[in-house]
Every structure is written in C-alpha cells, then in structure tokens.
From Swiss-Prot:
The gene is ife-5. The lineage of its organism: Eukaryota, Metazoa, Ecdysozoa, Nematoda, Chromadorea. It comes from Caenorhabditis elegans. GO terms for cellular component: eukaryotic translation initiation factor 4F complex. Pfam families: IF4E (PF01652). Belongs to the eukaryotic initiation factor 4E family. This is Eukaryotic translation initiation factor 4E-5. Disulfide bonds join C122-C126. GO terms for biological process: embryo development ending in birth or egg hatching; regulation of translation; translational initiation.
C-alpha cells in the first residue's frame, strides 16, 4: 500500500519573517528579531495561520517578510539605494482591510507574481500604528523608474482585483513611491513622492 504524502510546493526562493515588538524601553535593533524562514507553500501557511494578523498586533509592532539574504533595514546594502511603494491604511478603515491588503501583497510576493521584476524587490513591511498603519514593498533601486512603475502597476491590479471580490470599496485610495533616503532625512511629516497611483482615475 502506497503511503500518501503532502505535496511540498516549493517556492522559488527562501523568505524570512521578522517581527518588531512594541517594547518602548528597548532599542530598535533589540526589538527586531528574525522569527521564521520558509521556502515551501505548506511552511508558509502553517506559520501564517499560527500567528496574529496585522490587525491583532499592538501599536508600534511591525511585520517584515524579506528575501532571506536581506535584512529589513534602510541601511542594509541592498536597501540603501532603494525605495518603497507605500500604502497607508487610515485608522478609519476596518481591521479587515489592513489584513486583506497585507495578505494579498504577501501572496503576490512569495508567489513571484511580479515576473522579471522580482529580482528588484527586497521585501514587504507592515507598520502597525494607531494613527494609521502602513504597508510597503521595498525595491532595490529607486532610480530604476521603469521597473518600479511596473511593480506599482501590479500592486494596484492585485489590490483592485481583491477588492472587487470581497469588498464594496477599493482597499486603498492611492499608493506612493518614495526613496528610502528621503524617508531617513525627513524633517516633517510631508514626504516627496516620485510616483503615485490612484485606485480610481
């Protein structure tokens, strides 16, 4: 009798999940920990279903899912010349919207749905904040406008499709692209964006 085995469904690369806790008395470096590395679909779902969704995290916590060889830090060599596509989830949105946006982009990322531009993507970040949470896709080269715009278009398409299936309204109003160096040097809450894509034109 042949024993049935669970399909492995390997991913094309290793991904690491990092968690930033909300300990206000600790340094940022001490708060950030790598908690899991996965490279198959079953490994991903086993971990994902065992943890809290973003909406269940405390204020000031972050989830980061990055290629295993890249740390989720601006100063990392792979990130310093890069930027991010930023989605702001206003506090008026329901918790389900935050979780839906996070999962939709996460599945697109580990499923290699950005095609040849996957090599330009470093990882995905969710910053849980009381005044409005942020989800961002980090890219390697902020000056590669064509690649970054293609990534943004795929993001928009994925989120618009997800909204049409399960939500009566778009999951986002606008997504922006900004450079990491601009974020690091910011002196006000107003940041310059290189590109913006609206959910409804």
């Amino acid at each position: 009798m042949t024993e049935l085995t669970t399909p492995i469904y390997p991913l094309q690369r290793n991904w690491s999940w990092w968690f930033l806790n909300d300990d206000r008395n600790a340094s940022w470096q001490d708060r950030l920990k790598k908690v899991y590395t996965f490279n198959t679909v079953p490994e991903f779902w086993a971990f994902y279903e065992a943890i809290l969704p973003p909406s269940g995290l405390n204020d000031l916590c972050d989830y980061n899912v990055f290629r295993d060889d890249i740390q989720p830090k601006w100063e990392a060599p792979e990130n310093w010349d890069g930027g991010r596509w930023l989605i702001i989830i206003n506090k008026g949105k329901t918790p389900e919207v935050l979780d839906a946006v996070w999962l939709e982009i996460l599945l697109a990322l580990i499923g290699e749905q950005f095609g040849k531009d996957m090599e330009s993507i470093c990882g995905l970040v969710c910053n849980v904040r009381g005044q409005g949470s942020k989800i961002s896709v980090w890219t390697k080269n902020c000056n590669d406008d064509d690649t970054n715009m293609r990534i943004g278009v795929v993001l928009k398409e994925k989120l618009m499709a997800a909204a049409s299936k399960a939500h009566s309204k778009p999951l986002f109003d606008v997504i922006h692209y900004q450079t990491h160096r601009n974020c690091v040097k910011k002196t006000t809450s107003a940041l310059k964006y290189k590109f913006s894509l609206k959910s409804i034109v």
